[in-house]
């Protein structure tokens, strides 16, 4: 991974694509099993726990001391998040806490952008000993939080609530606006991914602050 965070990010995206469709494929093939569920969690841990924590760790500087190791906590909290998801019966239609793929995409896209645009604004933020450790801690807290977050996967059978419909529409609008901005400004493609998943977090946080207005 040294010198090629872009390759690591592409592989992470491939993992996210497979993760998106694996449940659907299992249902269509009638191949669901307990072993498959555990292997799915193991694959998620590697792709969306270990890999993003190492990518964010590599953005740090040895001179930061103990702060430079804070990004490695993402792997630990991702494991807790996956274990919680497997045991929590409340998370069939959506999530409680930030899903590991979303956390991973933020880490991966940031690492890829800093690598391709060393003189950019985000690169200057990442050069100091504050931004990366704080980002890592925020992601760790969100991973194990109880904040309701909508799922991007299809299926489930139950009708979506007004809150979920609002969040999906807001997410699509923010993503479209972010993509348009990236294209017009001719920015690195990884910024589009970073904007989308930052928007995913912000939409869910905003809706959590307005439970009465958005309740079904």
Language-model segments: residues:
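Membrane-embedded alpha-helical segments that form the functional core of polytopic membrane enzymes
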Residues: 1-38, 66-75, 135-136, 193
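Short juxtamembrane and helix-loop transition motifs at transmembrane-helix boundaries
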Residues: 1-7, 27-36, 58-66, 88-91, ...
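"…together with the soluble PPM/PP2C metallo-phosphatase catalytic core" -> "…together
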Residues: 1-5, 10, 61-93, 98-100, ...
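Helix-coil boundary and interhelical linker segments in multi-pass alpha-helical membrane proteins
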Residues: 1-10, 46, 50-71, 109-131, ...
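Alpha-helical transmembrane segments of polytopic integral membrane proteins
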Residues: 14, 52, 76-79, 83, ...
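C-terminal ends of transmembrane helices
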Residues: 22-33, 78-93, 97, 144-153, ...
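C-terminal membrane-associated helical module and adjoining short loops/tails
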Residues: 96-216
